[in-house]
A protein has these predicted regions:
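N-terminal amphipathic/basic leader segments beginning at the initiator methionine
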Residues: 1-23
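Mg2+-dependent prenyl diphosphate-binding active-site environment of isoprenoid biosynthetic enzymes
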Residues: 16, 23-148
């Protein structure tokens, strides 16, 4: 077992809560949006960013609801950037599977990426700390500029 796998194993209960919260945050009244998101979430990445949030929280205290809100926000922002990046780079395959724009089209992928970004900001608001919202917005700006 690699060190990263050991960390994932140690954080398994927190990661399970995180993934449940991500799915809840992305629930939509729109059937197509839910279909696209369900398909997208089946191809889970390493979740390094939320793992860093969870490890930091454990080091400095505890993993509570506010920490999970922040971890969800970070993961949603990251995924929004990946979805938008796939459109910009016209990438049709990521993690060995079709991207949203590869499976559907660029129009839908941009809207789904925006949906992820909007929900990242809402999760930032849920932390109750305006600095979290500011950080998400700033990171979003930097990601956009970096893509140019």
């Amino acid at each position: 077992m690699t060190t990263f796998q050991q960390i994932q194993h140690m954080l398994a209960p927190d990661l399970e809560r995180l993934n449940t919260r991500i799915a809840e945050a992305l629930r939509s009244p729109n059937v197509l949006m839910n279909q696209v998101i369900t398909n997208y979430l089946e191809k889970k990445g390493k979740q390094i960013r939320p793992i860093m949030v969870l490890l930091s929280a454990r080091l400095l205290g505890e993993v509570n609801d506010k920490v999970l809100d922040g971890a969800v926000a970070v993961e949603l922002l990251h995924n929004a950037s990946l979805i938008h990046d796939d459109v910009v780079d016209d990438t049709k395959i990521r993690r060995g599977a079709a991207t949203i724009n590869g499976m559907w089209d660029n129009h839908l992928a941009v809207l789904v990426g925006d949906f992820f970004l909007s929900n990242a900001l809402l999760e930032g608001v849920a932390t109750g700390d305006i600095r979290m919202v500011e950080s998400i917005a700033t990171l979003g700006r930097l990601l956009s500029i970096g893509e140019l």
